[in-house]
Amino acid sequence: MTQTAGTVLLETQILQNMGRADDAARVMRAGVKVFDTDPILRASLARLYISQDKFDDALEQYAILIAQDAENWEAVYAKALVHLEIEEYGEAESLFQRLIDSGERVDESRYYLATSFERQGQLERAIDNYRLVSIGTNNFLGAQQQATRLSIALGAVDAAHDWLQRVSRGQPRLEVLFINMEAQLLQQAGLPAKAKQLLDRSLNRYPGEVDLLFARVIYFDSIKDLAGSEADLRSIIAIKPDDARALNHLGYMLADQTTRYEEALTLLESAIALNPGDPATTDSLAWAQYKLGRYEDALQNIRRAFAVFPDPEVASHMGEILWMMGRRDEALAVWQRALEGAPDDPLVTEAMQRLQTQASEDESE
């Protein structure tokens, strides 16, 4: 068969699929020597080098592509991303700016130019560039989130809010999305009171807006205000009786933090009927069954949840259920495996310490 750039690419792809990356690179390098001016083949070699963390080799290939065609904007963009990846910020910024000046990949370049500034601690320049990313583009929401987070970190909370309001004016769905995002960022920044004020004001403007109610539930959860969380969750369920997320959240909260276990079970059975197979809801259902003393049912469901989502919280629950069934060696094995993946996880360590302490006290009586 006559060799072409296409056959080189095909052979390389086959070798990669077989896990023979080094052989694929060898074939590709040989092909590039033969088909020196084929941009697709050389760009493929550069991407192969990137997959092998051979960034200098990738940069060399992109440099050749740009030398062959100064307006190969995909090569310019890819080269800029590699420089950013290996923290060669000056080179990356120069190339991103070149793309912007040429009207090519402008919004992506703005986003990554801002990322470069952020990584170097030039936060105000980062904010300015994040805010220049155009609405409706792939990076728009991420850019606004980063700009808002950095503004809050700099203490410019009101300015961040005003910017989001200005950008979303006349677009209620976008405004609600931004309010939710801003509230989360305020909480993460240690400003829960401001988050609560924002949500209260916004719910006065958009009463019954489910996403904002749920955001306020997260606030109430953070300050352990059970009554506040329950009130907003019940408001959500009244508006959307089939909201499995709210049913699960309320059911788990009642099972975990109250003795209203039957009520919790009813809510969780409704949630699982709406969202069968969801591991988080299955875990919650198992927890309510455990609290009601239905250990076998609880174990069956917790195993099902853990098989799909082996999260430390699910592991802590499964261990506790096994422990209370008298299967302590199995419980310890579950906890130990969880701690191997998440050392010192507070949920797992709390369950272990609480139950082991209780067992020691029972034995000493």
Where are these regions (language model features)?
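Structural marker of alpha-solenoid helical repeat scaffolds
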Residues: M1-T2, V34-F35, Q68-D69, D101-G103, ...
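Start-of-helix register in tetratricopeptide repeats
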Residues: G6, I40, E74, E108, ...
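Canonical tetratricopeptide repeat
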Residues: L10, S44, A78, Y112, ...
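Residue-level recognition of tetratricopeptide repeat
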Residues: Q13, R47, L81, T115, ...
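Register position in tetratricopeptide repeats
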Residues: N17, S51-Q52, E85-I86, R119, ...
